[in-house]
């Protein structure tokens, strides 16, 4: 039997890097980890509330956190930062202030920067959000998958695989459906593969979306 491993963890140190960069004493490690989770959840909720979009795509690809002794630097990689900033020109400062209060970090400065991704639909997280929005609007899963692949192809990807599992179209028996376009060498460590696993709540229950995108070979 093939042992399934997370493609990002499998390539850590070769084509993938860490999303959190900090050192901590063993006794404080769990606290720092919880703080990271709190920061990420807070930012996602804030962006969801303040984005001017009907599709439900927040467009956050990833959130990098770097911690020093007296500074927490947060970099938000977004596909569509305009949708957030157009609505609120001071969105970054506002987010920074509210997050600082939430974390209650008195002796540490918080710095938030938003970086735009050149090709948003070349990112699996943004594509998964797009598919989730389509499924919530009761669009046929095959149509949603094909549209996602079209968008990914426009972003110059070398290959993509999309998988949806669960009670698809409200059927009584759960099943797995997948579609692949191009090359996706999941066993090759030097292959730069981006991956995302994303749960979506529909009226029939929870569906799981998985996306593998083959970007390049190192």
From Swiss-Prot:
The gene is rps3. PANTHER family: 30S/40S RIBOSOMAL PROTEIN S3, SMALL RIBOSOMAL SUBUNIT PROTEIN US3C. This is Small ribosomal subunit protein uS3c. It is found in: Plastid, Chloroplast. GO terms for cellular component: chloroplast; cytosolic small ribosomal subunit. One of its GO terms (molecular function) is rRNA binding. Pfam families: Ribosomal_S3_C. One of its GO terms (biological process) is translation. Part of the 30S ribosomal subunit. Keywords: Chloroplast, Plastid, Ribonucleoprotein, Ribosomal protein, RNA-binding, rRNA-binding. Belongs to the universal ribosomal protein uS3 family. It comes from Ipomoea purpurea (Common morning glory). Gene3D superfamilies: 3.30.300.20, Ribosomal protein S3, C-terminal domain. Residues 39-118 form the KH type-2 domain. InterPro entries: KH_dom-like_a/b, KH_sf_prok-type, Ribosomal_S3_C_sf, Ribosomal_uS3_bac-typ, Ribosomal_uS3_C, Ribosomal_uS3_CS.
């Amino acid at each position: 039997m093939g042992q399934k491993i997370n493609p990002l963890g499998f390539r850590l140190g070769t084509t993938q890097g860490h999303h959190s960069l900090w050192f901590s004493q063993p006794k404080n490690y769990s606290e720092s980890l919880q703080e990271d989770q709190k920061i990420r959840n807070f930012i996602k909720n804030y962006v969801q509330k303040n984005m001017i979009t009907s599709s439900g795509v927040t467009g956050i690809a990833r959130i990098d956190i770097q911690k020093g002794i007296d500074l927490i630097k947060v970099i938000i990689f977004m596909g569509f930062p305009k949708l957030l900033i157009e609505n609120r020109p001071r969105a970054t400062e506002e987010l920074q202030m509210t997050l600082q209060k939430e974390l209650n970090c008195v002796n540490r400065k918080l710095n938030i920067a938003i970086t735009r991704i050149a090709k948003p639909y070349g990112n699996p997280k943004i594509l998964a959000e797009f598919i989730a929005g389509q499924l919530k609007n009761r669009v046929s899963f095959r149509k949603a998958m094909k549209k996602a692949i079209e968008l990914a192809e426009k972003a110059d990807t070398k290959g993509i695989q999309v998988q949806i599992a669960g009670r698809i179209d409200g059927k009584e028996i759960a099943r797995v459906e997948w579609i692949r376009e191009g090359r996706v060498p999941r066993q090759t460590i030097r292959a730069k593969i981006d991956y995302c696993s994303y749960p979506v709540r529909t009226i029939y229950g929870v569906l799981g979306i998985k996306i593998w995108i083959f970007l390049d070979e190192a």
